[in-house]
Amino acid sequence: MADITDIKSILYTEKSLSLQESGVLVVQTATNVSKNQLKEIFKEYFGITPLRINSLRQEGKVKRFRGKIGQRASFKKFYVKIPEGAKLDALSV
């Protein structure tokens, strides 16, 4: 069962802010969350049934720190289309 803690953050980038005007919310989650689980989270915690959910997996970048090679954490990103007129107070999460 998915929980609200599976949502790491709501992404605020230039692209995501322009998509918010058309009713699409960009959410960053853990890599083990599926579309169905995210749909359940939105229904249970926000009272909204998403119209469409698109997902992509973002691999962590390889970075160097003090001569050592490391890797940033991988994550999953979801584009969630919410119904027109639905209010989602993202800051209250």
Curated annotation (Swiss-Prot):
Keyword entries, A-Z: Ribonucleoprotein, Ribosomal protein, RNA-binding, rRNA-binding
Parts of the chain that traverse the membrane: none
GO cellular component: ribonucleoprotein complex; ribosome
Keyword Ribosomal protein: yes
Xref: InterPro entries: Nucleotide-bd_a/b_plait_sf (IPR012677), Ribosomal_uL23-like (IPR013025), Ribosomal_uL23/eL15/eS24_sf (IPR012678)
Keyword check for Ribosomal protein: yes
Annotated GO biological process: translation
Pfam name, any one: Ribosomal_L23
GO MF annotation terms: rRNA binding; structural constituent of ribosome
Known role: One of the early assembly proteins it binds 23S rRNA. One of the proteins that surrounds the polypeptide exit tunnel on the outside of the ribosome. Forms the main docking site for trigger factor binding to the ribosome.
Family assignment from sequence similarity: Belongs to the universal ribosomal protein uL23 family.
Oligomeric form and interacting partners: Part of the 50S ribosomal subunit. Contacts protein L29, and trigger factor when it is bound to the ribosome.
The protein's name: Large ribosomal subunit protein uL23
Species classification: Bacteria, Pseudomonadati, Campylobacterota, Epsilonproteobacteria, Campylobacterales
